[in-house]
């Protein structure tokens, strides 16, 4: 698939037969602070509900970002197909979303563009949710407080729209609430169903926190209560991620692997997995800022990945339109 920053391709490691998604970004001026931030933030994150970053590789024409491939496509598509989810199914995915976001925040990374289109699913029967696309994320360790307005209007918190300095972690909570609402209702909470493209109206409704759960949607009072604690205009009074994780609705049928104790033990085990060093990644990004040889097409780039023998990645599905096929979607 192609987007603003480049193309995404599905590739296969010829040794392990494992599939990966590779985002190709043209060398030169496109390798800017956004790209650098995406890579730096993403490479630090190792969690079952976050698309795993593998490495960056330089080809003569492009910077290639190699990451885990989620074969189940977008959560958005699953909702489109279903219309809306039952409360139990919505909770199943919301628990995973909060688990991933909570981990990001513990690593001092706020995503800032959480939406259904940035949540993918793996291919398992009970699908595992995977957060992707860290192009707008901001790490408080590396960066100052977010000031710019990013994101899709439907998901944006009121404090982000008002362009004041805001806490990205608290704004992420709002976006998680929008995601939960869409899963359960099959519509956006602050859009006028008669005028969904009227962004001015959507923004007015967000700023005045004007939403309701339709009568035809049967959800518990606990769920309604949680939504009412997320959709709070004043960020200081909004429920926090740790509070969500203790909310009765969230705790119901919480899988063992979602508990904090289990996740801490898994993270310790994960420390041993080798990762491309920060220095190595930085050096490749710096080199990628120099313009490359533009004579090669995408097939050539993928061939370069193999011929350079970097992890022996081989091109698998020739020129598949990965975006529309639903195999891999990552808005670039």
From Swiss-Prot:
Active-site annotation: 113 (proton acceptor)
GO molecular function: ATP binding; protein serine kinase activity; protein serine/threonine kinase activity
Domain of life of the native organism: Eukaryota
Enzyme's top EC category: transferase
Post-translational modification: Autophosphorylated.
Catalytically driven reaction(s): L-seryl-[protein] + ATP = O-phospho-L-seryl-[protein] + ADP + H(+); L-threonyl-[protein] + ATP = O-phospho-L-threonyl-[protein] + ADP + H(+)
Residue span, Protein kinase domain: 1-250
Residues reported in the UniProt entry to bind ATP: 1-8, 23
Swiss-Prot/TrEMBL keywords: ATP-binding, Kinase, Nucleotide-binding, Phosphoprotein, Serine/threonine-protein kinase, Stress response, Transferase
Enzyme Commission code(s) on record: 2.7.11.1
Keyword presence, Phosphoprotein: yes
SMART domains: S_TKc
Pfam families per the UniProt record, alphabetical: Pkinase
Spans through the membrane: none
Inducing or repressing factors: By abscisic acid (ABA) and dehydration.
Family membership: Belongs to the protein kinase superfamily. Ser/Thr protein kinase family.
Function in brief: Involved in water-stress responses.
Name the UniProt record assigns to this protein: Abscisic acid-inducible protein kinase
Organism in which the protein naturally occurs: Triticum aestivum (Wheat)
